[in-house]
Amino acid sequence: MALINFDLLAELPVAYQAFAPTVDVLPLIPLFFFLLVFVWQAAVGFR
């Protein structure tokens, strides 16, 4: 039975550590699109 060390998966490799702040923000991008739908509909009057 193979045991997976999830701490290893949760950490970026050393070569990508510079991108850590960007990776932290990436999951929020779909939420911005979701909110943009409501802003757009409010702008056009919820047609």
Curated annotation (Swiss-Prot):
**Gene Ontology annotations for the cellular component aspect, listed alphabetically:** photosystem II reaction center; plasma membrane-derived thylakoid membrane
Q: Which InterPro entries match?
A: PSII_PsbK, PSII_PsbK_sf
GO biological process terms, alphabetically, are: photosynthesis
Which UniProt keywords are given for this protein, alphabetically ordered? Answer: Membrane, Photosynthesis, Photosystem II, Reaction center, Thylakoid, Transmembrane, Transmembrane helix
Q: What does this protein do?
A: One of the components of the core complex of photosystem II (PSII). PSII is a light-driven water:plastoquinone oxidoreductase that uses light energy to abstract electrons from H(2)O, generating O(2) and a proton gradient subsequently used for ATP formation. It consists of a core antenna complex that captures photons, and an electron transfer chain that converts photonic excitation into a charge separation.
On subunit structure and binding partners, the annotation says: PSII is composed of 1 copy each of membrane proteins PsbA, PsbB, PsbC, PsbD, PsbE, PsbF, PsbH, PsbI, PsbJ, PsbK, PsbL, PsbM, PsbT, PsbX, PsbY, Psb30/Ycf12, peripheral proteins PsbO, CyanoQ (PsbQ), PsbU, PsbV and a large number of cofactors. It forms dimeric complexes.
Q: Which family does it belong to?
A: Belongs to the PsbK family.
What name has this protein been given in UniProt? Answer: Photosystem II reaction center protein K
Annotated source species: Prochlorococcus marinus (strain NATL1A)
State the organism's lineage.
Bacteria, Bacillati, Cyanobacteriota, Cyanophyceae, Synechococcales
Q: Which gene encodes it?
A: psbK
